[in-house]
Amino acid sequence: MLKFVILLCSIAYVFGAVVPLGMLSQSDGRIVGGVESKIEDFPWQISLQRDGRHYCGGSIYSKNVIITAAHCLRNVVAEELRVRVGSSYWEHGGSLRNISKFQIHESYVEPTKEYDVALLKLDSDLSFNSTIKAIELTNEIPPEYADAIVSGWGETLVPPPGIPDQLRSVDVKIIHREKCASRNFGYGSNIKASMICAYAIGKDSCQGDSGGPLVVNNLLVGVVSWGIDCARPSYPGVYVDVSHVRSLIVSNAESI
């Protein structure tokens, strides 16, 4: 599948076309152009795991609810999933928790990644401390070009191959939906109302970071969703706009 995706990217580049949406959802993600980080600086960060392997990120919303991306939950059941909290390392440390159920946003559209957000319900409550904390949701869209930070685990595009054990983070700038859909960038009408973008030359979230946090001033402003390639010029990372889906997150978290 990976070779097929790379081939599609090459064809798209040569002919100036956009790879079909969903082909490069950032679900097996990596942080590109980032640095090793400690969980104390991102205590809301979790590793979503299946079959003992990290494959998506997420954010702690409350003592028993995690926010992640809807596309991370395709073709899975809750019993297959685990969440590691409180560790800078996806493979060890902290605490590994079971998922009792999950809920995908009712307006999620798989082909376009609209409303690409979901909630996970833990089977027991977390105890908050310096490495395990909830993150507050933003009430509004952050200013254009605001400093933001993305964190997660995954391939770094530099040797050795494979995903790094330690959490990584990268600084990016907020790009509003209207500008992300403009001629300044390559997405056009693929950017929908539920999305926001972030961009920096040579820096990006990528496959495996999906569901993870985009943060401004310690507020969750975005959920890693999709993009064309990773850190590719003119193609910012695309995120769920948390201000756009906040009310439904809050109400569903109370009822899940």
From Swiss-Prot:
Residues 1-22 form the signal peptide. CDD domains: Tryp_SPc. The record marks 204 as: Required for specificity. Disulfide bonds join 56-72, 180-197, 206-230. Residues 23-30 form a propeptide. One of its GO terms (biological process) is proteolysis. Transmembrane segments: none annotated. InterPro entries: Peptidase_S1, Peptidase_S1_PA, Peptidase_S1_PA_chymotrypsin, Peptidase_S1A, Trypsin_dom, TRYPSIN_HIS, TRYPSIN_SER. GO terms for cellular component: extracellular region. Its EC number is 3.4.21.-. Pfam families: Trypsin (PF00089). Specificity, limited to carboxyl side of arginine residue in B-chain of insulin. PANTHER family: AT26814P-RELATED, POLYSERASE-RELATED. Keywords: Disulfide bond, Hydrolase, Protease, Secreted, Serine protease, Signal, Zymogen. This is Hypodermin-A. It is found in: Secreted. Residues 31-254 form the Peptidase S1 domain. GO terms for molecular function: serine-type endopeptidase activity. It is an enzyme of class 3 (hydrolase). The active site is at 71 (charge relay system), 116 (charge relay system), 210 (charge relay system). Its main location: secreted. It comes from the Eukaryota. Belongs to the peptidase S1 family. The keyword Glycosyltransferase does not apply.
